[in-house]
């Protein structure tokens, strides 16, 4: 099938140039100042937000690294719905992290690599990188892996000690919320790059979870206590992976979906184990997998008109990762109204979808499908001293 052939060609690594950096950074700064209701200037009780992981949270770090357009979204039509220009976010507008910052009365959290005044980093920092995984080997050399994101966080922690002093910095680190989305690329990359696993699926999941466990313990040692997690969505049902289905039918890519399920079971077990064994460790886990499947199965129930096809892309389900025409495949189609779609491109979601997810993550027990969040919601975590 031609779509599958194109997708295999598209899967990784082309040279790109940076687009709209200065303009986009200015818009982001102004948007952050205007949209958030800042009420804690000089407030010692401010709760900061730190973000780690992949494209579900990356607000533009990949704009500033030597990578390819497969891992960048700094060209139109990305960003068209909210910012009016591309910002590096893999969506038509805002991400979950942007909405959470707004609900917490914080400015838009700046990417770690964004040039500018370090004072902007005193309410939190976004370390996430599109394409990143818990494994160093995942798209190695083209993304900022979780281990490097941790190194960047340690630099900010030193900056905080300089700005606030040792004791005040320690209090702020402890009060901060750490939101993490990681794992999707560790599994989807196997299929997108046509690899074969040298180990069993369960062993692969164990290594991913092991690296994530080490990361959490490192943040905890520095002083972090309040963590939020997005689990891995049903990857096999994403348009980019569905077109790789060898049966040439409309089903999801079974092994990709299976890896996501295995990861999520292991992640849930890990977090509840840590809650029992690690003093002061508190967490919120968002079942992104279930939430996305509900919307794909019943799009109209959640205000969508299209539950499977992407808004932007090429081929069946617009599953070829061609949105914007800056990747290997230059031709692409763009829907009229992204708000009607769950998927923005073949691997990412629309602002409308992220907005719904952010509401669930923040409000927890007040939504119709609230069982997807627990044992705390993110609002609860922000309220804990």
Swiss-Prot record:
Transmembrane segments: none annotated. Residues 1-35 form the signal peptide. Coiled coil: none annotated. GO terms for molecular function: lipase activity. It comes from the Eukaryota. The active site is at residues 55, 345, 348. Its EC number is 3.1.1.-. InterPro entries: GDSL, GLIP1-5/GLL25, SGNH_hydro_sf, SGNH_plant_lipase-like. Keywords: Glycoprotein, Hydrolase, Lipid degradation, Lipid metabolism, Secreted, Signal. Glycans are attached at residues 45, 66, 194, 211, 289. GO terms for biological process: lipid catabolic process. Its main location: secreted. CDD domains: SGNH_plant_lipase_like. One of its GO terms (cellular component) is extracellular region. It is found in: Secreted. It is an enzyme of class 3 (hydrolase). Belongs to the 'GDSL' lipolytic enzyme family. PANTHER family: GDSL ESTERASE_LIPASE 5, GDSL-LIKE LIPASE/ACYLHYDROLASE. This is GDSL esterase/lipase 5. It comes from Arabidopsis thaliana.
